[in-house]
């Protein structure tokens, strides 16, 4: 009997090795992901405002004010105020989707990868609306799924649930719909975000990456597709772990790891090049959780839960981004590697503060930068080549200032950029010719093309002007102001630019946008 047990165990190991070898280093893993450069943004599928569908509590403007709502005891739950809520709370789903698509295109985005967790069937109609509206309005845009933190049940259950929903969407919008984000050889590009949970990974498995690849192959088979999966990196990954996943995956993308001298992207990009895998660029503009979390966890409070927990049992997560520094450097890093895809983190995750979508703090500033860098990356003329542009970025108080009375614990989730770098006013200029930039009365010379100028913070609104030969070519003053006495914790970056009206008028006309932050 013992001999039979040994024989059976040997057969199982051999069969596993054969299966593993059948997925390892497949020729298609070294094939191109795309034949054109694209900006792909992570889209939080359910964070959208239309009639009968509110924003989740962590970005719901009902809890923006520090008074007059159930979260007044903590000075207001949220610090974000999306433009959509001001304009589209009574609109149809299709009308809101049309606004989202136009705003994304104006921001330089070509495609969405939809945040896609289990047990969110109601979201599928939103995804289908994007296909429907982009087609009806002839808006060039591509779409795909981002399989996100699956958990619960067995691998067969998780795969089956995703397959059921994906099949329904693909059948409804058309499997051959040209808006699906595909490789030149026809594979469906699928993103992972904490996606390894799709697989059952036995304790001590010699290759967790094989288990994950096998699970995604099972999902691809059940939706009658071939996948090109982009593996997610949200840690200081080791070369050994990275190589294990590159044995089975054609590409990877990095989540919110900030740029600094030891940026993990250097190792990841070099390893991908050695392995003939695709390194895709990533950039995020900010990171501060308007959502309130149970202290020491990532558990999100509802508005009622936040009010009940109060300041002592809550915290907010934060990554120092150096105003626009991190966003610019990550874009420059991707351009220097001539990546085929640049991933924007994110389009509309207002609760984590890394959104490009129009909102009271970020406005259009980061979108202006993305449009400029996109033209450099694609070796095309700058969209601002015929005029002078200035964009300012600042925090609304210095990092050493203590808000009163609503001071939340701030927990840094990544390090690398000096917090003091955010105690300034930064102005990024895109100039036709050299000029003088004046900020708060401090004047400095700025070069043609892209330039960055910083001055110390000063209380009040930020005034910016650009002049040549003592004549102003542009001038603006920010609606928001720097304060010495903040009421509540808020480390969101504020941005505003000389392009404010030119950016928003095609989107909203002359409608009032929002109050002051």
Residue ranges and their predicted role:
Residues 1-22:
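Bacterial Sec-dependent N-terminal signal peptides
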Residues 429-433:
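Non-cytosolic beta-sheet module surface loops
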Residues 20-423, 434-450, 457-472, 476-517:
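Glycan-processing catalytic domains of CAZymes
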């Amino acid at each position: 009997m013992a001999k039979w047990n040994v024989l059976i165990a040997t057969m199982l190991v051999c069969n596993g090795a054969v299966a593993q070898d059948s997925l390892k280093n497949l020729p298609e893993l070294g094939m191109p992901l795309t034949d054109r450069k694209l900006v792909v943004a992570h889209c939080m599928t359910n964070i959208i405002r239309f009639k009968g569908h509110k924003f989740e509590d962590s970005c719901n403007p009902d809890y923006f004010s520090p008074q007059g709502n159930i979260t007044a005891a903590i000075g207001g739950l949220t610090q974000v105020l999306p433009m959509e809520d001001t304009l589209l709370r009574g609109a149809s789903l299709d009308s809101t989707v049309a606004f989202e698509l136009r705003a994304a295109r104006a921001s330089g985005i070509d495609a969405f990868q939809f945040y896609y967790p289990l047990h969110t069937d109601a979201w599928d109609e939103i995804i289908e609306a994007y296909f429907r509206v982009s087609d009806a309005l002839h808006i060039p845009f591509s779409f795909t799924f981002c399989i996100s933190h699956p958990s619960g049940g067995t691998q067969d259950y998780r795969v089956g649930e995703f397959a059921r929903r994906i099949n329904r969407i693909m059948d409804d919008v058309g499997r051959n719909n040209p808006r699906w984000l595909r490789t030149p050889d026809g594979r469906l590009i699928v993103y992972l975000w904490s996606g390894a949970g799709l697989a059952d990974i036995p304790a001590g498995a010699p290759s967790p990456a094989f288990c994950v690849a096998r699970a995604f192959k099972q999902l691809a088979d059940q939706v009658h597709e071939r996948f090109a999966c982009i593996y997610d990196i949200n840690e200081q990954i080791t070369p050994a772990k990275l190589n294990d996943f590159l044995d089975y995956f054609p590409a990877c993308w990095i989540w919110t790891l900030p740029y600094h001298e030891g940026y993990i992207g250097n190792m990841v990009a070099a390893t991908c090049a050695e392995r003939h895998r695709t390194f895709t660029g990533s950039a995020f503009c900010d990171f501060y959780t308007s959502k309130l979390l149970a202290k020491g966890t990532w558990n999100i409070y509802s508005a009622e839960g936040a009010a009940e927990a109060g300041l002592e049992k809550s915290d907010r997560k934060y990554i120092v981004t150096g105003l626009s520094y991190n966003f610019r450097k990550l874009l420059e890093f991707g351009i220097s590697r001539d990546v085929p895809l640049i991933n924007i983190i994110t389009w509309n995750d207002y609760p984590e503060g890394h959104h490009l979508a129009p909102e009271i703090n970020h406005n259009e500033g980061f979108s202006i930068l993305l449009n400029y860098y996109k033209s450099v990356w694609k070796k095309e003329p700058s969209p601002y080549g015929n005029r002078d542009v200035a964009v300012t970025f600042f925090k609304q108080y210095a990092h050493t200032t203590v808000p009163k009375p609503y001071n939340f614990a701030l927990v840094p989730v990544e390090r690398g950029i000096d917090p003091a770098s955010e105690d300034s006013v930064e102005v990024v200029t895109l100039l036709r010719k050299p000029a003088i930039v004046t900020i708060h009365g401090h004047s400095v010379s700025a070069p043609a093309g892209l330039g960055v100028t910083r001055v110390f913070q000063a209380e009040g609104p930020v005034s910016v002007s650009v002049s040549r030969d003592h004549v102003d070519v542009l001038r603006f003053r920010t609606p928001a102001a720097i304060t010495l006495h903040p009421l509540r914790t808020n480390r969101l970056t504020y941005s505003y630019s000389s392009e404010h009206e030119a950016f928003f008028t095609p989107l909203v006309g002359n409608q009032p946008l929002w109050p002051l932050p």
